[in-house]
Amino acid sequence: MSKTLGSLSVGAKIEVPVLSAYQSRFGSKIVFKIADKNHSGYPSNSVTLITEKIIQLMCFDAKEASNSNSDRKQYGNNRYQYSNLLQWLNSNAAAGAWYSAKHSADAPPTNANVWNNYNEYDAWAGFLAMLDPKFVAELLTTTQTVARNTVTDGGSYETVTSKMFLPSTTEVGLANENNIAEGTLLALFSNDASRVAYPTAQCVSNSEYTNSNFSTSKGWYWWLRTPPSSYANVVRNVRTALWSTTTRTTATLAFARFVILNLLSWYLTARTATEIIR
């Protein structure tokens, strides 16, 4: 029996179909959790979803060899609106066609531009191209508040609009960066345990990077969109031990739980997404 998303509780799980060509990377379906409903600052009458698990190991942004800032030259750019990851998440382009430069020194996440040559994704199709198009058609454009670092980007904050996006420290219940609230707390994130995320089997098996602690049974790092105020090249992420934030250089690998999206609350789960009853 079909249900509306709005009738389900925060924490309920939804399966979204992956197109057959991409199932080796993500499995046949990606599982999302309801993170909130009618969340402040998000589209009205919407339901917010986030992936249940860490679905890929990817860099936030690639090294920028022509950037005049030495940190960004070596490690990548932490300005969220310019990140490779955000662009890929919101693209429905075919394989190898999702990337375009967002500023004069921008660079794609090629093998040469990612940490230790692990897990480049410049040749992939855009993320939206990998999902059921009927589901993608229902995604709502959402405005996000993003802090800016004080070193290169002027401090304060800016807004970014997209359909898929990364959460902020504020939204997962961690400290505001430089006293800037990047949105408001999502209802799903009530304590440390609620921030724990585990890699999927496909995330582990598809990764060129290996580690004895990188497994489906152990929690791992996942990206946030928040840049530390005093750095040009690192980004906050939820870490494994204390489930608080740490920082990682943008070309380094962290795990992409990443996906937050909004759908109207009347969206029927039977249309393309299916509720998981557990």
Provide a role label for each language-model segment.
Residues 1-278:
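Collagenous Gly-X-Y triple-helix signature in extracellular proteins
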